[in-house]
């Protein structure tokens, strides 16, 4: 019995765009580093951190990115981004507790990160690396709490190496597993879809909220 394997159309195949010969192949490394910096340093928590690094590791098995360039580069950029977050915490940290919710910022991001920091102390700097949202706001909380900067920097470097290096290398080694290697395109599509869900859901909720507000204002009598 013959089993037909349906290939993805070229434009739906992620390798068409981000493979070694893909249209955006040369942009993968700088784009990854920019996204990681924005997530960690500019307080934008909805970017797909882990999934992006894991995908980068998978792509390294195809030759799109050199894993031994990607891993240390991500670790360095993540640590640099965190220094911005720490500085923000030192300078304007208290104001974040008064900031109103918006499409991409929720007050509970800050309060939950603060509670986590209070519970785990200095180890939060490492643990929060692996927790979405918290890795964005933990540097701010550390700065707000006036944690000793040399101590913070030491823990942050360890966390950056474990997260930036660990997740990418894990993706690289998993990408060499025969089953994963044979289905790499579909796996990357799945990762991209899942990683974009939080941003899509947040955008949808923001749109619904604005629509309800607009309808309420129209319903008010003159």
Swiss-Prot record:
It is a multi-pass membrane protein. It is found in: Cell membrane. The chain crosses the membrane at residues 23-43, 67-87, 157-177, 187-207. One of its GO terms (cellular component) is plasma membrane. Keywords: Cell membrane, Membrane, Transmembrane, Transmembrane helix. InterPro entries: DedA-like, VTT_dom. Pfam families: VTT_dom. The keyword Endoplasmic reticulum does not apply. Belongs to the DedA family. This is Uncharacterized membrane protein ML0287.
């Amino acid at each position: 019995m013959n089993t037909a394997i349906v290939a993805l159309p070229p434009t739906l195949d992620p390798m068409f765009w981000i493979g070694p010969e893909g249209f955006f192949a040369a942009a993968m490394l700088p784009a990854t580093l920019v996204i990681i910096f924005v997530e960690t340093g500019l307080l934008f928590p909805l970017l797909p951190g882990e999934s992006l690094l894991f995908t980068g590791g998978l792509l390294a098995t195809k030759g799109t990115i050199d894993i031994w360039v990607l891993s240390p580069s991500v670790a360095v950029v993540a640590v640099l981004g965190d220094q911005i977050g720490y500085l923000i915490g030192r300078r304007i940290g208290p104001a974040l507790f008064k900031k109103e919710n918006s499409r991409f910022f929720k007050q509970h991001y800050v309060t939950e990160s603060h509670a986590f920091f209070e519970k785990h102390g200095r180890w939060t700097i490492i643990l929060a690396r692996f927790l979405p949202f918290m890795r964005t706001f933990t540097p701010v909380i550390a700065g707000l709490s006036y944690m000793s900067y040399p101590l913070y920097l030491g823990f942050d470097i360890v966390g950056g190496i474990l997260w930036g290096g660990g997740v990418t290398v894990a993706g690289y080694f998993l990408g060499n597993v025969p089953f994963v290697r044979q289905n790499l395109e579909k796996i990357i599509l799945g990762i991209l879809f899942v990683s974009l869900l939080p941003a899509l859901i947040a955008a949808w909720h923001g749109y619904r909220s604005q629509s309800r507000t607009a309808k309420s204002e129209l319903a008010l009598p003159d």
